[in-house]
Amino acid sequence: MASSKAAINLQDIFLNQVRKEHVPVTVYLINGFQLKGTVKGFDNFTVVLESESKQQLLIYKHAISTISPQKPVIFSGSEKDDKKEE
């Protein structure tokens, strides 16, 4: 039954929170580059980042190592789902 239920996607929850709250992030790529800005959108394969100079960057997720927010992200939706599974 767990397979038919929508699985919690922590990645989507995280990206959506930083997008909605306009939290500045640092994106570390696997080649060592660092990109700073705010998340404007994302899908299954890409993240759109708006840099501090207002340039929009389309980043492929397979090139991302880490995304570090400048402030803690509250995972409000995941707590409700955790309680439902108990």
UniProtKB/Swiss-Prot annotation:
GO terms for biological process: regulation of DNA-templated transcription; regulation of RNA stability; regulation of translation, ncRNA-mediated. The keyword RNA-binding applies. GO terms for molecular function: RNA binding. InterPro entries: Hfq (IPR005001), LSM_dom_sf (IPR010920), Sm (IPR047575). Belongs to the Hfq family. RNA chaperone that binds small regulatory RNA (sRNAs) and mRNAs to facilitate mRNA translational regulation in response to envelope stress, environmental stress and changes in metabolite concentrations. Also binds with high specificity to tRNAs. This is RNA-binding protein Hfq. It comes from Caldanaerobacter subterraneus subsp. tengcongensis (strain DSM 15242 / JCM 11007 / NBRC 100824 / MB4) (Thermoanaerobacter tengcongensis). The lineage of its organism: Bacteria, Bacillati, Bacillota, Clostridia, Thermoanaerobacterales. The gene is hfq.
